[in-house]
């Protein structure tokens, strides 16, 4: 699932393959821009803004794309087989003499003037991986709606840009609160530490091929107080007393681990929808309302 760190990696790959090169092939397979021809123009740079990709092209043009849930950009050598999906899922092709970038299943693809990029990304909050990162502004925006559930607030890119559903679940676990707890009900000091941890986690994963939240030094000081109850008697509790706090083979604490034992307390991880997103939490470690 693309989030701020993976989008940044995608931007870096596209920039390396396309920037400074003249396009010899251009194919935008969306009705509005199907006749647009970018061949002969030089790609200036490719940059990430939150979870958005901006490919800036000679002549004051920007190709704006968003991966959402399952979109992707792949880069291929001239003789390499395209393996990103069937041909009908291709939405964009940008090629030069050395590489071809192919966009698959792109739910958002538009060509706009570079001077009008704010139409696409001007609504975004501070970018967790960007030069404009401002934790104070992100905190203010989160606190502007204290009644809003924390999980929904973290996903709102107007508050802070770059968090997706995986990080939402993991951050709430690390804060020891459920995603349904209102922002204003968080214990004192937890939200600022959570915002700081979000930035640290995305930076820790920005160059990793596989995202993890369980084997990084950024987790040495958890953002929330330990409000988890003592484990109830039984096999799970016995296992939790001897289980190390982190097992290297597990990349994530809760996301994708429904019904499996919590890495901290052994309680089975729960799964429910929040705003149509699958949401994972540990009822033993995380306090707050649940569905």
Each language-model region and where it sits:
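Basic, nucleic-acid-binding surfaces and adjacent catalytic neighborhoods in DNA/RNA-processing proteins
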Residues: 22-37, 47, 81, 142-291
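Phosphate/anion-contacting hairpin/loop surfaces
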Residues: 63-176, 182, 189, 194
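Acidic, proline/glycine-enriched N-terminal capping motif
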Residues: 1-124, 283-291
């Amino acid at each position: 699932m693309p989030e701020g760190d993976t989008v940044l990696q995608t931007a870096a790959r596209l920039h390396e393959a396309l920037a400074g090169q003249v396009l010899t092939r251009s194919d935008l397979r969306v009705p509005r821009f199907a006749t647009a021809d970018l061949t002969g123009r030089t790609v200036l740079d490719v940059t990430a803004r939150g979870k958005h990709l901006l490919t800036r092209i000679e002549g004051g043009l920007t190709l704006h794309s968003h991966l959402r849930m399952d979109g992707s950009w792949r880069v291929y050598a001239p003789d390499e087989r395209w393996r990103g999906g069937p041909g009908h899922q291709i939405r964009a092709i940008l090629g030069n003499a050395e590489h071809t970038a192919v966009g698959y299943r792109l739910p958002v693809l538009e060509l706009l003037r570079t001077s009008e990029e704010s139409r696409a990304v001007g609504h975004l909050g501070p970018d967790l991986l960007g030069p404009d990162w401002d934790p104070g502004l992100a905190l203010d925006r989160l606190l502007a709606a204290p009644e809003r559930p924390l999980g929904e607030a973290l996903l709102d890119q107007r508050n802070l840009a770059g968090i997706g559903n995986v990080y939402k679940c993991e951050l709430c676990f690390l804060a020891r609160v459920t995603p349904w707890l209102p922002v204003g009900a968080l214990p004192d000091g937890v939200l600022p530490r959570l915002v700081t941890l979000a930035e640290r986690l995305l930076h820790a994963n920005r160059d990793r091929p596989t995202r993890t939240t369980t084997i990084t030094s950024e987790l040495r000081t958890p953002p929330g107080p330990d409000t988890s109850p003592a484990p109830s008697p039984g096999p799970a509790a016995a296992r939790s007393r001897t289980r190390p706090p982190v097992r290297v083979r597990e990349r994530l604490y809760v996301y994708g681990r429904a019904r499996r034992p919590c890495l901290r307390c052994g309680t089975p991880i729960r799964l429910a929808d929040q705003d149509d997103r699958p949401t994972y939490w540990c009822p033993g470690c995380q306090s707050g309302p649940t569905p």
